[in-house]
């Protein structure tokens, strides 16, 4: 009898121990999820961007007066603008190098640094705040370009943000590079024990994509190990007649803008 009581007691102690460990781990993930998703890096406020092409540095006030920094690269006789949302790492110091991908094809391109990235102020807190920032930046560029000449583009984490933005506006087209079907689902594959209701970022691309009536172009590398290719295969099934899917053979997650097949197809799209 005493042995049975002892076993029950030890079982309860072990259960309590594992519960405490679980709560501690979940709490850590909850309070650090922004840093786990966004690998931001700051640049000095007096940092001078150095690119061998014409560009303008823009500072846009967000809803809470936080300053959002972006670069507008310009080309002669521009056909329009590409509003570009980059991935979860890197700043305009490096992302600006890909601007020529679009300026060489006759389009101006605006690249935004999210909060805490580069020279942008503030800290990212949640999905709603991030979407508000992006919407304000987009409306600012709409005051310079007719919206029917603006193409929204997003790479990696930026793909879900771009999809939401396009679903709430009327751009010329939407270009997605290495998109995820659902960020909620993608993050669960990385941290399966973390409850969905505690996540600050859901970014359900699959929910917003069907709402978009302008041309949609999806590019995904077949060798992508970060956001598996299957994500775009599933998104492709949701596309209507306005959708186009371009698999890029042997392409990983990084470096798509330098991919020759991507560049050739982009040339056709933007002609």
List where the protein language model places each region.
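An N-terminal hydrophobic leader/cap segment in hydrolases
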Residues: 18-61
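Membrane-embedded segments
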Residues: 63-140
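Hydrolase active-site cap/lid region
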Residues: 159-214, 260
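Short beta-strand/loop motif that positions the catalytic acidic residue
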Residues: 212, 218-220, 224
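Acidic catalytic loop of the alpha/beta-hydrolase fold
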Residues: 223-227, 253-254
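Catalytic histidine-centered segment of alpha/beta-hydrolase-like enzymes
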Residues: 251-261
